[in-house]
């Protein structure tokens, strides 16, 4: 009987330690994506402010007719769908969104911020989320690497562009990047909240 109690105590301590570790990892991941999202908002705002009134009107009109490459990634359609999604699903979608930008982010004009640093920050964030996925996988729901896919690059943006076309593509990339980082921040925040039973995870 005493041996059973000891085993149960050890298992309880191990589970508690794992939960604390998960919370810490989630906190780091949320903090990192918040930083990236703030950068995305800043550079999108700076880019808009640098445009002439007519240029701003034109790129806005064009972008409304276009869509983000990552729209092909199946994700929750609204906040209620997000709240109903499992932690593992939210983490897996977040990885896919980040993967779609690891290469593309190198071709965005980031003002004074080095382009490769954004890509590096995304890679670090993806590594952290993958660790969370491994820690939260179980037999009931498994999202393996085979379920992920690489999106095609954003059109022909990597070719030499000039004039208005270059302006338009940079605007599109900044707008889509900001949108996708907002999604990742939301998904990670909800997933982190799920680890706290007493927390209110309402968006």
UniProtKB/Swiss-Prot annotation:
Residues 1-17 form the signal peptide. Zn(2+) binds at residues 35, 185. It comes from Solea senegalensis. Coiled coil: none annotated. One of its GO terms (biological process) is growth hormone receptor signaling pathway. It holds the Pfam family Hormone_1. This is Somatotropin. Keywords: Disulfide bond, Hormone, Metal-binding, Pyrrolidone carboxylic acid, Secreted, Signal, Zinc. The keyword Signal applies. InterPro entries: 4_helix_cytokine-like_core, Somatotropin, Somatotropin/Prolactin, Somatotropin_CS. The keyword Iron-sulfur does not apply. Belongs to the somatotropin/prolactin family. It is found in: Secreted.
């Amino acid at each position: 009987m005493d041996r059973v109690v000891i085993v149960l105590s050890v298992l309880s301590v191990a589970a508690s330690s794992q939960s604390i570790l998960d919370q810490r990892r989630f906190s780091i991941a949320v903090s990192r994506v918040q930083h990236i999202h703030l950068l995305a908002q800043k550079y999108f705002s700076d880019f808009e402010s640098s445009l002439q009134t007519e240029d701003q009107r034109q790129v806005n009109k064009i972008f409304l007719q276009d869509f983000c490459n990552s729209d092909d990634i199946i994700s929750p359609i609204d906040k209620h769908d997000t709240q109903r999604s499992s932690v593992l699903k939210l983490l897996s979608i977040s990885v896919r969104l980040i993967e779609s930008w690891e290469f593309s982010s190198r071709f965005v004009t980031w003002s004074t911020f080095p382009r490769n640093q954004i890509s590096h920050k995304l890679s670090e964030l993806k590594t952290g989320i993958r660790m969370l996925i491994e820690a939260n996988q179980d037999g009931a729901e498994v999202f393996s690497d085979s379920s992920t896919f690489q999106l095609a690059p954003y059109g022909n943006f990597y070719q030499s562009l000039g004039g208005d076309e270059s302006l338009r593509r940079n605007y599109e990339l900044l707008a889509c990047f900001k949108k996708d980082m907002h999604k990742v921040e939301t998904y990670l925040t909800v997933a982190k909240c799920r680890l706290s039973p007493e927390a209110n995870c309402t968006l």
